[in-house]
């Protein structure tokens, strides 16, 4: 890893301002899923053990350009205190006298959390005045928020113009696994792409046609490919304006010798809800009017397993069906379990964040993959081969 991390700097007695990703679901003032807080614990604990004073910054939700009590990060501070087993001081502000006083009183090994970074509209504009205010509170910046790495905001990118920025453990792990998967994967390298829209994945498919040995398509975007193959898709979700593009991608894959695997059957229903009548239609026969596909069918599951069997590196981004409804979760679950079983055989298995990470945890498989990314949009842009601003802003290691 070519970036400086918290291991590379002296933290004793330093004021450390740390950008974490505590964008967690909250109901009635209580955190309902603390996964993201738990994932930041190793970084926070390490920095505290080194004798630093820690100031935490995070966003939560999408407040409309100003403070909104619904999006306060106070419940996240309370949950963190329980997990750490120590007090987490909370100031309901982002800068100003109250914040400066709290920072001045902070002792080594203590934690202070500031309010939701997005309560200041400058955050998402990468306002440098705002970044300067935060930088003035600390000696060093720790970036452990991979989930926002594809965004240039004041709290992760702007601040690095004024004080040195280093990676936390979570950020380091994300970069390590995703870099390996995108830059020098052990081959055969197989990518599984699901989700509803081809348009969301065009950049990824185009970039991976130069890197992957096989690309497996699933989720509703498979129907745009079925249409490109001249097949009927009934009432399934199809991006009409992307059918020609799907044809081009099929052609490009052929030219580059990359196997683009399209599911051969689908589990269909007349309504997207649990307990309705379901039928399996094949790509060849097509899906009749009034029916729509909501999952890959049994033949597709076997086809996909056979294409994954010899892989040495697997990256999976996007569910293969509407996994939130049990009737249509079978394809995603079967493929997730199969990929998980390959991890034990020494295959590097990486799950992109977002819906695929949610699916993996719904099936209780999150410990069974080499790496489950914490960033949906960020992992997608990483796979597109883009440089992410929130990684570029972290200081580079000096070449020895």
UniProtKB/Swiss-Prot annotation:
Residues engaged in binding substrate: 21-23, 36, 59-62, 118, 151
TM regions (residue ranges): none
GO biological process: gluconeogenesis; glycolytic process
CDD domains to which the protein is assigned, alphabetical: Phosphoglycerate_kinase (cd00318)
Catalytic activity: (2R)-3-phosphoglycerate + ATP = (2R)-3-phospho-glyceroyl phosphate + ADP
Complexes and interactors: Monomer.
Protein name: Phosphoglycerate kinase
Provenance organism: Fervidobacterium nodosum (strain ATCC 35602 / DSM 5306 / Rt17-B1)
Lineage summary: Bacteria, Thermotogati, Thermotogota, Thermotogae, Thermotogales
């Amino acid at each position: 890893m070519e970036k400086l991390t918290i291991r590379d700097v002296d933290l004793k007695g330093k004021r450390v301002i740390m950008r974490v990703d505590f964008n967690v679901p909250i109901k009635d003032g209580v955190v309902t899923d603390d996964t993201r807080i738990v994932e930041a614990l190793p970084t926070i604990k390490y920095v505290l053990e080194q004798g630093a004073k820690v100031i935490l910054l995070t966003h939560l939700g999408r407040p409309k350009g100003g403070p909104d009590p619904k999006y306060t990060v106070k419940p996240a501070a309370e949950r963190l205190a329980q997990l750490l087993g120590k007090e987490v001081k909370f100031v309901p502000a982002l800068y100003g006298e109250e914040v400066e006083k709290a920072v001045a009183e902070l002792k080594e090994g203590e934690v202070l959390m500031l309010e939701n970074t997005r309560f200041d509209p400058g955050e998402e504009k990468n306002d440098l005045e705002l970044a300067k205010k935060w930088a003035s509170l600390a000696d060093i910046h720790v970036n452990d928020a991979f989930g926002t790495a594809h965004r240039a905001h004041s709290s992760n990118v702007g601040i690095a113009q004024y004080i040195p920025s280093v990676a936390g453990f979570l950020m380091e792990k994300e970069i390590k696994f995703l870099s390996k998967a995108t830059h020098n994967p052990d081959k055969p390298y197989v990518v599984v792409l699901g989700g509803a829209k081809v348009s969301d994945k065009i950049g990824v498919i185009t970039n991976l046609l130069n890197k992957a040995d096989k690309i497996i398509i699933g989720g509703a975007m498979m129907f745009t490919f079925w249409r490109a193959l001249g097949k009927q898709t009934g009432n399934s979700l199809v991006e009409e304006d992307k059918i020609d593009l799907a044809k081009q991608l099929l052609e490009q894959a052929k030219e580059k010798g990359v196997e683009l695997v399209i599911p051969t059957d689908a589990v269909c229903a007349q309504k997207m809800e649990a307990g309705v009548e379901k039928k399996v239609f094949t790509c060849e026969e097509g899906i009749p009017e009034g029916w729509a596909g909501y999952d890959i069918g049994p033949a597709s599951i076997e086809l996909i397993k056979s294409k994954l069997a010899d892989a040495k590196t697997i990256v999976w981004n996007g569910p293969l069906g509407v996994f939130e409804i049990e009737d249509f979760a079978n394809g995603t679950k079967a493929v997730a379990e199969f990929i998980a079983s390959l991890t034990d055989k020494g295959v590097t298995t990486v799950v992109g964040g977002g819906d695929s990470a949610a699916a993996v945890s719904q099936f209780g498989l999150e410990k069974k993959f080499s790496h489950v990314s914490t960033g949906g949009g960020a992992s997608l842009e990483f796979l597109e081969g883009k440089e992410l601003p929130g990684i570029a802003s972290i200081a580079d290691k000096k070449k020895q």
